[in-house]
Amino acid sequence: MGAGPALLSFHAGACLLLRPVHRQGLPRYCGDFWYETSFFGPCGMERLGHCSPVWLGHHRARVFVNGVEVAQHEGGFLPFDATVTNIVRYNQFNKLSVLANNELSETMLPAGTTRTLADGRKIAAPYFDFYNYAGIHWPVWLMALPKERVLDYSTRYRLTETGAEIDYTVSTNGPHPVTVELYDGATRVAESSGTTGTLVVKNAKLWNIHAAHLYDLVIRIHEGSAVVDEYLDRIGIRTFEIRHGRFLLNGSPVYLRGFGRHEDADIRGRGLDLPTVKRDFELMKWIGANCFRTSHYPLR
């Protein structure tokens, strides 16, 4: 596979779980290291038209599927993907390999330098006061997507005397018509059509602190009577405003009490650990917090 230690193979399946280097007994290692696993390409997935794995890794990564390089990435705080539709072997096993690197430089985040010792070993010299976490921190998902699909959407909210209005914009990669519906449980409360429009919600239940009501948003692409793609998400209707030095939620002042929250913990470093995430939120609620700040990167 090349230079650098080969870490333990990670779990093969629909969700490929990769373990970060700082939990493998190599806390001072600096340089290249490999992850490798196999996964099964389900029969029929190739007909959907787009197949891509999604992962998140520090600090640099080169990704290979069946020996073919499919992606390079630098920066560890946002996910990235690669199209592997024509590389995956369907109805058989495939090999996924990731060459990761945790060397620091002054042009990356977090910043630092990498020094080379007299014996040739490299060491990290960070410009920060926390451990230089590295490796793949989240599960890797293999996604099969239709050829024409919803790429993104955005919403803006307005409160009215009778409820609320939601202005939306949907981005797709094809020409077919789009419909948007909003559900409260099993009840459809608003609908519209087109890639831009407005959902009018009567007697809207607003998202609020300790009462975070959520609606189900359903976006569909239609080709005749067939649904080409369907995208579901949960949204809360609320407005934020800062006026005269006060933070207003839905037009009412709110005193913010909370924490700056990091992702790392004693159990798995920065590797995803859902019980720890649950514990953190329960502790914040127990102590009376009503907010937290992502410190200092987007949390996944």
Regions found by a protein language model. Give the residues of each.
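Secreted/periplasmic carbohydrate-active enzymes, especially glycoside hydrolases
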Residues: 1-300
